[in-house]
Structures are given as structure tokens and as C-alpha cells.
């Protein structure tokens, strides 16, 4: 079943309101095994709304609209649906009673224009609105189904979940299963190139989502039986792992700190942090994981040179000669925090997050990561970021976690 979602309202086109309804509906429909091929937005203009609906009924089996069901003059959805389906609007006495009852319950006066909401296209089924006055519309035609819901997210969601979702599940008896693979250390474009021949797969379908310094691959299969779907997904996962498995750090509901915590526990080792430009963000992400006290010794936020020297043992001459942002300083920070907190592994970051503080030699976004391993050997990594201050700090944590993850994953026998 192919679906189109239409959001109605001039305020959406002007950017006054963000359209969260479409994202919600797309996620729910996809979860039911329905293919959302189109999402449209149209203003409160009868002619343009009619054309949008006309296009939708020609290319989709299921059309869901949000907005335009209220009592005012710019609420035009009923009229447009009536015209496109050639079903005249008919007053429903039962809806008149419901609308009057709503205002009586609120002890407020009902203006006459509210009765506009009691009109539905002939043959349509009203969708109960338990939190508002505007009922939804469900109209089945020979080749398509139109469902209209209010634009207010609270009303739309409760009506969809209580009335529309059960109806759709009954109509579209497909099971859908998804699996997510999480990647670090490889960009979206490179990953797509390596998987190019399978990215166009229809069932299971593959979708890449990049952001926050990592990439997700969502594999979605649908069918009548769970076993067949899972087998198809497993074949894709096997292919992906054979090609780019070294960059996969986890599956489904997980995070990089979570997987690092599992590896630290599995290896039976502890870690300590020395953070400069991230200001404790790495430690915060580690301690977000329940049970992290088993492997996290603690950290030093060494923002000033004095703290680097006095609390981490960084040589004053190193800072004077090489600078606070240098591979030498990062190495001494990692080694120092490992020794002073008596941890097996020391991880450090020092850099220029911005927006000020950069030079031609050391620009904003320059970061060094230091990693002191269980044998005391220290490695450093140079990074250059181009974001704003917050993005640079976040990407620094991601990169530090990446090097730590690879060390824990591949340096132990």
C-alpha cells in the first residue's frame, strides 16, 4: 500500500509552525508496512488544496491529511474532499449533538460556525475526537482511501492511535521488522559507495542516516511471516558485515559509550580521563551508562595549563615549547591521568573548540586525542573540525570514543 501525507495550513508554509505531524505519521505508517512515497504541504487555498488532493488520489492508495477541519473560513479540507470524491457534504445530526455536548461540558457558548464541523462527505465515517470538536473523516473509494485528521498534534495523535491505526493494521496485514547498524569512523558517502549495489534493495529496504559523528544504516523488511523477514534481513546484515564490519560498533538500541562500557567490562580494565576542550563531556557520557563505576576511575578537567601541570604531571617545558594544544601535551595528559588515578587506560583531549583562540598554525577546530594503553604506550591522534563550538566539542568526544573503541576491540587477544 502506497501512502501520501498532506499537511494543510498556510502557517506551515510561512514557517510559523514546524510540521511534526508528517514525521509522526510517516514513522507510524512505515511501522505498519505501508510505503510512504510522498509528503506534501499546502496552504489554506481551496484551488491548490484540490490540485494537491487530485495528484494524491492518482498516485497513492492511502491519503492522510492533517489540518483544515476546524470551524473557520480558512478550514477547507471538507469542501476539497467533497469535490475530489464527488461526495456532497451532508450534515450529521449525531455530530451536531457531539459538538453541542462538548461546549456544554466546557460551559462555554458555541458560536454557529462550529456546526460546520458536523458536515461530512456523503458515505464518510466520522473519526471520534475525544479531546476536541473537529471529528476526523474516513472515506473509502474504489481505488483509494482518504483519512483526514485535525492539525493540532495532540488531537491528531490520539485520534490516529485510537481509531486510525487499528483500521490501517486491519487493512494492511503486513508485518514489518527493522534492524539498525551503527557505524563510526566511516563517512556516509564512503559507506554508500561500499554498499552501492545493495542500497537500492526494495525488501528489505536500506536507508542511511548520518549525524552526530556517526552513521546509522536502517534495514527494514516486511512480509507475512516473521521468520522470512528476519532471514532476509540477516542476509543483508551478513553482506554489510563482510564489507565494512570493522566500522560497525553496535546494533539497534545502543550508543558508543554503551558499547565501550561493555568492552571495558569484558576486558576487565579501567579508564581515567583528562579533558580540556570538552570540559567533562566525555565523562558525562560515560557516566550516563548505569554501572559505569565498575570501570570508570574518574577524570580531571584540565582546562588551564596550571591544572595540566600540577594535577596531571604535564611538563611545563612541554607546554612552553609545544603549546597546550599539541600531540606532546595530549600524550603527557593521557599518561599522567592513567598513573595518578591508577587506571589501566588513560584518555585525553586537548584542542581549540572556538569560536576564538585559533591561529594560522593552530586553527579553531584543531584537537589532539591521547590514549595511554595498559602497557603504558601512548598514541596520539590529530583532528580538524569545522563546526561551531558545541559541534566541535561533541565531535571531539565521538572521535575520542572511536579511538578508545578500536583499541579495546582490536588490541586485546
Curated annotation (Swiss-Prot):
Q: Return the InterPro entries for the record.
A: CinA (IPR050101), CinA-like_C (IPR036653), CinA_C (IPR008136), CinA_KH (IPR041424), Competence-induced_CinA (IPR008135), MoaB/Mog-like_dom_sf (IPR036425), MoaB/Mog_dom (IPR001453)
Superkingdom of the source species: Bacteria
Cross-referenced SUPFAM superfamilies: CinA-like, Molybdenum cofactor biosynthesis proteins
Question: What NCBIfam families has UniProt attached to this entry?
Answer: cinA_nterm (TIGR00200), molyb_syn (TIGR00177), PncC_domain (TIGR00199), PRK00549.1 (NF001813)
What PANTHER family does the annotation carry? Answer: NICOTINAMIDE-NUCLEOTIDE AMIDOHYDROLASE PNCC (PTHR13939), NMN AMIDOHYDROLASE-LIKE PROTEIN YFAY (PTHR13939:SF0)
Q: Which family does it belong to?
A: Belongs to the CinA family.
Q: What is this protein called?
A: Putative competence-damage inducible protein
Please tell me the species this chain comes from: Halothermothrix orenii (strain H 168 / OCM 544 / DSM 9562)
Amino acid at each position: 500500500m502506497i501512502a501520501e501525507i498532506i499537511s494543510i495550513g498556510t502557517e506551515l508554509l510561512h514557517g510559523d509552525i514546524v510540521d511534526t505531524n508528517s514525521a509522526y505519521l510517516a514513522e507510524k505508517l512505515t511501522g505498519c508496512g505501508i510505503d510512504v512515497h510522498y509528503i506534501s504541504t499546502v496552504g489554506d487555498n481551496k484551488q491548490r488544496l484540490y490540485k494537491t488532493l487530485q495528484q494524491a488520489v492518482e498516485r497513492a492508495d492511502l491519503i492522510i491529511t492533517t489540518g483544515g477541519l476546524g470551524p473557520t473560513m480558512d478550514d477547507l479540507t471538507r469542501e476539497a474532499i467533497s469535490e475530489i470524491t464527488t461526495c456532497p457534504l451532508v450534515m450529521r445530526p449525531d455530530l451536531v449533538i457531539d459538538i453541542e455536548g462538548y461546549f456544554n461540558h466546557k460551559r462555554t457558548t458555541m458560536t454557529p460556525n462550529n456546526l460546520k464541523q458536523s458536515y461530512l462527505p456523503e458515505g464518510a465515517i466520522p473519526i471520534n475526537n475525544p479531546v476536541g470538536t473537529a471529528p476526523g473523516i474516513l472515506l473509502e473509494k474504489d481505488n483509494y482511501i482518504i483519512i483526514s485528521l485535525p492539525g493540532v498534534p495532540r488531537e491528531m495523535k490520539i485520534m490516529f492511535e485510537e481509531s486510525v491505526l487499528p483500521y490501517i493494521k486491519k487493512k494492511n496485514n503486513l508485518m514489518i521488522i527493522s534492524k539498525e547498524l551503527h557505524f563510526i569512523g566511516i563517512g556516509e558517502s564512503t559507506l554508500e559507495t561500499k554498499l552501492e549495489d545493495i542500497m537500492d534493495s526494495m525488501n528489505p529496504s536500506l536507508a542511511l542516516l548520518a549525524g552526530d559523528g556517526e552513521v546509522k544504516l536502517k534495514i527494514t523488511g516486511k512480509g507475512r511471516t516473521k521468520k522470512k523477514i528476519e532471514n532476509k534481513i540477516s542476509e543483508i546484515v551478513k553482506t554489510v558485515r563482510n564489507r565494512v564490519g570493522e566500522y560497525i560498533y553496535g546494533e539497534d538500541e545502543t550508543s558508543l559509550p554503551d558499547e565501550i562500557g561493555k568492552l571495558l567490562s569484558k576486558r576487565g580494565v579501567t579508564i581515567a580521563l583528562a579533558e580540556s576542550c570538552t570540559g567533562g563531556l566525555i565523562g558525562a557520557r560515560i557516566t550516563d551508562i548505569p554501572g559505569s563505576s565498575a570501570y570508570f576511575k574518574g577524570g580531571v578537567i584540565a582546562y588551564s595549563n596550571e591544572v595540566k601541570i600540577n594535577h596531571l604531571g604535564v611538563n611545563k617545558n612541554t607546554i612552553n615549547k609545544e603549546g597546550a594544544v599539541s600531540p606532546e601535551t595530549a600524550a603527557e595528559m593521557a599518561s599522567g591521568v592513567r598513573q595518578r588515578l591508577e587506571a589501566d587506560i588513560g584518555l585525553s583531549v586537548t584542542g581549540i573548540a572556538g569560536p576564538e583562540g585559533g591561529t594560522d598554525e593552530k586553527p579553531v577546530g584543531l584537537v589532539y586525542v591521547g590514549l595511554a594503553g595498559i602497557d603504558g604506550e601512548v598514541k596520539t591522534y590529530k583532528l580538524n573540525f569545522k563546526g561551531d563550538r558545541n559541534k566541535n566539542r561533541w565531535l571531539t568526544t565521538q572521535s575520542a570514543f572511536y579511538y578508545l573503541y578500536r583499541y579495546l576491540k582490536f588490541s586485546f587477544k
